[in-house]
């Protein structure tokens, strides 16, 4: 059976490193806690670029620490399953978990957009029904429906942040603490990197994948924080595709995770059949 470690010894490790960076970057773009909370926090406190960088790095550090703790635990447990016959079954089980995670991410994003659009249509219908004299511009309505999308949970966090910090002076320690606590939220992409690390059974490469994921996450979070400090509105005006990219990021992320799961599942199945 061709194991992941054998593939890495053959010089194929380059595939996993950029994939981990891409997963981290896509996770940072997904609508949810990190991006929405950071942008809301920076805007509410009227933060500087330096504070935005601090916030992004703090969230990345805490996120990396959580992944490290889980990864070390997984690697310790995986040492009990060193038999050659157990390896393909572990790969197959991991593949099922990864593919299920990808499907859940895709379905959650699709359902969230559907519910959001249905609520918008319902609101417009009720408004039109109660006020026949008021007319909406169709072009503006279309743009509003397909504008920036946020799930209700993330928007609630953003509103709460605005109420708590609007107009207040905050210290660097408070900014770091906010970033550290925000980065503790687990994500499906980090779970995928964890499962890959367990299958590789290589501490050095596992650490590299975790660091690569963190680099991608840091690039996105710092960029979003700096963009919020400069002005998110200006960025959206200058680049019309920014909102579309942010809204579609979960689909790309789930597709990439699904491909990783299929790859692992095929190798696990081939190992079982031999």
UniProtKB/Swiss-Prot annotation:
Disulfide bonds: none annotated. Induction: By nickel and cobalt. Transcriptionally repressed by RcnR. Probably also regulated by Fur. Cadmium, copper and zinc have no effect on the transcription. GO terms for molecular function: nickel cation transmembrane transporter activity. Residues 1-12, 78-86, 197-209, 273-274 are periplasmic. Residues 127-153 are annotated as: Disordered. Its main location: membrane. The keyword Heme does not apply. Residues 129-144 have a biased composition (Basic residues). GO terms for cellular component: plasma membrane. It is a multi-pass membrane protein. It is found in: Cell inner membrane. The keyword Cell membrane applies. GO terms for biological process: cobalt ion transport; intracellular nickel ion homeostasis; nickel cation transmembrane transport; response to cobalt ion; response to nickel cation. The chain crosses the membrane at residues 13-33, 57-77, 87-107, 176-196, 210-230, 252-272. Keywords: Cell inner membrane, Cell membrane, Cobalt, Cobalt transport, Ion transport, Membrane, Nickel, Nickel transport, Transmembrane, Transmembrane helix, Transport. Residues 34-56, 108-175, 231-251 are cytoplasmic. Belongs to the NiCoT transporter (TC 2.A.52) family. RcnA subfamily. Efflux system for nickel and cobalt. This is Nickel/cobalt efflux system RcnA.
């Amino acid at each position: 059976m061709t194991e992941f470690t054998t593939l890495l010894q053959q010089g194929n490790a380059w595939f996993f490193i950029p994939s981990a960076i891409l997963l981290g970057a896509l996770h940072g773009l997904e609508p949810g806690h990190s991006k929405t909370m950071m942008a809301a926090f920076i805007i509410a406190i009227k933060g500087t670029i330096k504070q935005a960088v601090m916030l992004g790095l703090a969230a990345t550090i805490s996120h990396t620490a959580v992944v490290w703790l889980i990864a070390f635990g997984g690697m310790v447990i995986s040492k009990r399953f060193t038999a050659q016959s157990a390896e393909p079954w572990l790969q197959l089980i991991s593949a099922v978990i990864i593919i299920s995670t990808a499907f859940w991410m895709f379905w959650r994003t699709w359902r969230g957009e559907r519910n959001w659009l249905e609520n918008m249509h319902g609101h417009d219908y009720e408004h039109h029904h109660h006020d026949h004299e008021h007319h909406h511009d169709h072009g503006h309505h279309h743009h509003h429906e397909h504008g920036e999308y946020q799930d209700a949970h993330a928007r609630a966090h953003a509103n709460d942040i605005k109420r708590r910090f609007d107009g207040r002076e905050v210290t660097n320690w408070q900014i770091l603490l906010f970033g550290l606590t925000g980065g503790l939220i687990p994500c499906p992409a980090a779970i995928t990197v964890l499962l890959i690390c367990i299958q590789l059974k290589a501490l050095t490469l596992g650490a590299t994948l975790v660091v690569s994921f963190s680099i991608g996450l840091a690039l996105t979070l710092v960029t979003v924080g700096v963009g919020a400090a400069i002005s998110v509105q200006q960025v959206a005006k200058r680049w019309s595709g920014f909102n579309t990219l942010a809204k579609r990021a979960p689909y790309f992320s789930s597709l990439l995770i699904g491909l990783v799961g299929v790859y692992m599942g095929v190798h696990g199945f081939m190992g079982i059949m031999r």
